[in-house]
A protein has these predicted regions:
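C-terminal helix-rich "cap/oligomerization" subdomain common to oxidoreductases
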Residues: 18-19, 31-32, 51-59, 69-70, ...
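Hydrophobic residues in well-ordered beta-strands that form the structural core
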Residues: 80-81, 104-106, 232
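N-terminal Rossmann-like dinucleotide-binding module
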Residues: 1-34, 48
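Mid-domain beta-loop-alpha active-site segment that forms a flexible
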Residues: 107-114, 144-176
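Active-site loop of classical SDR/Rossmann-like NAD(P)-dependent oxidoreductases
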Residues: 24-25, 232, 256-270, 281
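Beta-loop-alpha module in the N-terminal Rossmann-like domain of NAD(P)-dependent dehydrogenases
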Residues: 5, 33-98
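Contiguous beta-strand/loop segments that form the cofactor/metal-binding neighborhood of enzyme cores
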Residues: 159, 163-237, 269-276
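A contiguous active-site-proximal alpha/beta segment in oxidoreductase catalytic domains
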Residues: 46-49, 85-145
Length: 299
C-alpha cells in the first residue's frame, strides 16, 4: 500500500517523507518508486525531525495501532490509517484515547471506487436502498495468507474481509437489528470458516450475507432499489438490472484514475489532503464497525 500512496502523492506533486523500519523493505520501496526511505522506524524519525502535520500510515496490520499512536502522541493533527486500523476493538479504543482532538480516518479505499460513486448517484436517483446482499467468501478459496504474520492470519476477517463488509454497509446503512451465525474453522483461522447473517439497517433496508471460506466464491455486493439491482462483482465494476427483466448491463464509468492507480486510492488520498472527506470512515465509526465485524467473524 505504501507504494500505491507514493504513486498518488508523486502525481499530485505533494512533498513527503517516507519512513520505514528495515533496510530490506526500504531498498525494495526505493527500487520500485525511486523515493528514498528514512529507516529506523517512526519513533526515531519523530525524535530527529519532529512530527508532520499530516501522516499516512501504511504499515503491516499488526503495527498499525502502535504506529498511529506514536504519531498522535507527538501532536500530528490528521492521520489516514490503513484499514482496518488495528487487530480489534481494544487497539482502536487505545488509538481513540491517544488521538485527543486529532482526526483519524480509516482508509477503506473501496468507498472511493468509481463504481461506488456512480452507484451512490444512481441509488439516490432511485430513492434509496430497499435491501441488499453481499458475499464475503475469500478467493481463491481462502488460501493461507503466508505473506502476513500469524497474528494477522488469525484475524483475517478484520484485516481483509472487512473491506467488502464496509462497502456494503456504507451503501446500505449500518446494521441495527440483526443476527449472525458462524461455524467451521481453518488451520490458520480458528474463529470460523463459514459465515451468514441478516437483519435491518438504520436506513430501513433489509440485508443478508454469506461466506464460505472452504468453497469457491468471491466478494460481491448487490444493492436493490425499487427500480434497479446494482451488482458489484468484481467490486471495481458495476452492473445494473432494471425491474421487469433479468438482463444486466455494464455501467460505463469514468474510472481512469482507478485504472492508472490502485483503485480508489487516488481519490481517497486527494480527499484526505484536502480535508473534510465526507466519504471517509472516521475512527469513531470504525470502533462501532469493529464490534460488528468481530461478532460476524465469531471472535
Amino acid at each position: 500500500m505504501a507504494r500505491a500512496y507514493a504513486a498518488v502523492l508523486d502525481d499530485l506533486e505533494v512533498g513527503y517523507m517516507v519512513v520505514g523500519r528495515g533496510d530490506r523493505s526500504a531498498a525494495a520501496f526505493t527500487s520500485a518508486t525511486g523515493r528514498a526511505v528514512r529507516v529506523g522506524g517512526v519513533e526515531s524519525a519523530l525524535c530527529e525531525v519532529g512530527p508532520p502535520s499530516l501522516a499516512i500510515v501504511a504499515v503491516s496490520v499488526d503495527q498499525l495501532s502502535d504506529t498511529a499512536g506514536a504519531l498522535l502522541d507527538t501532536g500530528v493533527s490528521r492521520v489516514l490509517l490503513e484499514k482496518p486500523g488495528g487487530l480489534g476493538s481494544v487497539e482502536l479504543t487505545r488509538i481513540r484515547e491517544r488521538a485527543g482532538s486529532a482526526e483519524v480516518s480509516i482508509a477503506y479505499n473501496r468507498r472511493h471506487y468509481a463504481s461506488t460513486g456512480e452507484a451512490r448517484r444512481l441509488i439516490a436517483r432511485d430513492g434509496g436502498v430497499t435491501s441488499f446482499a453481499f458475499e464475503l467468501t475469500e478467493w481463491p478459496n481462502a488460501m493461507e495468507p503466508v505473506q502476513v504474520a500469524p497474528v494477522v492470519r488469525r484475524r483475517w476477517f478484520l484485516a481483509q474481509t472487512s473491506h467488502v463488509v464496509d462497502l456494503a454497509f456504507h451503501l446500505g446503512g449500518r446494521p441495527v437489528d440483526w443476527s449472525c451465525h458462524s461455524s467451521g474453522a481453518l488451520e490458520w483461522h480458528a474463529g470460523a470458516a463459514r459465515f451468514s447473517g441478516s437483519g435491518l439497517t438504520d436506513s430501513g433496508a433489509t440485508f443478508g450475507y454469506h461466506g464460505d471460506w472452504e468453497a469457491p466464491g468471491r466478494w460481491s455486493v448487490e444493492i436493490l432499489t425499487r427500480s434497479h439491482r446494482y451488482v458489484f462483482r468484481p467490486l471495481e465494476e458495476l452492473r445494473v438490472g432494471a425491474l421487469g427483466t433479468d438482463e444486466q448491463a455494464v455501467v460505463e464509468l469514468d474510472d481512469r484514475l482507478d485504472r492508472s492507480f490502485k483503485p480508489g486510492v487516488y481519490c481517497e488520498t486527494r480527499a484526505f489532503l484536502d480535508g473534510g472527506d465526507p466519504l471517509s470512515c472516521s475512527l469513531d465509526e470504525q470502533i462501532e464497525n469493529m464490534a460488528v465485524y468481530e461478532k460476524m467473524a465469531g471472535y
